[in-house]
Amino acid sequence: MQATDSKNKVVYWGTGRRKSAVAAVRLVPGTGAITVNGRDGETHFNRIPTYIQTIKAPLETLGLENEYDIIVKAEGGGLTGQADAVKLGVARALCQLAPENRPPLKSEGYLTRDPRAKERKKYGLHKARKAPQYSKR
């Protein structure tokens, strides 16, 4: 959704989920800075460049990587899940920014929610599928 913040800047919203991570993403016109939970994106993701590249991928597809600041509130999951949740939120916010952004993002797969999640543990098994050792006698 489009809204305005306290400084009358236009803000675009998007929500992303991956595994057990949820990310509420705001896109604000700026210089390309990433802020996650009030901290610098590099600090939050332990300076691992893969996560930063993942987050910026939808912006790079459209050539907007230095035109919008990304402000994120991320909860749950680990760093990989949060990074992928932010990527989905950024892509959804870019679709609200301009409807013509949708086809290139969809063709790259940035608007698809990854449905893979941890399988539940079953009784009688050690983990979701790991069975106790079988003994014939």
Swiss-Prot record:
Keywords of the record: Ribonucleoprotein, Ribosomal protein
Region of interest: Disordered: 100-137
Keyword Amino-acid biosynthesis in annotation: no
One Pfam family cited in the UniProt record for this chain: Ribosomal_S9
Any single GO CC term annotated in Swiss-Prot or TrEMBL for this entry: cytosolic small ribosomal subunit
Biological process terms in GO annotation: translation
Family: Belongs to the universal ribosomal protein uS9 family.
Cited InterPro entries: Ribosomal_Su5_D2-typ_SF, Ribosomal_uS9, Ribosomal_uS9_bac/plastid, Ribosomal_uS9_CS, Ribsml_uS5_D2-typ_fold_subgr
PANTHER family xrefs: RIBOSOMAL PROTEIN S9 (PTHR21569), SMALL RIBOSOMAL SUBUNIT PROTEIN US9M (PTHR21569:SF1)
Repeat listed as a keyword: no
UniProt biased composition (Basic residues): 118-137
Lineage of producing organism: Bacteria, Bacillati, Cyanobacteriota, Cyanophyceae, Oscillatoriophycideae
Protein name: Small ribosomal subunit protein uS9
GO molecular function: RNA binding; structural constituent of ribosome
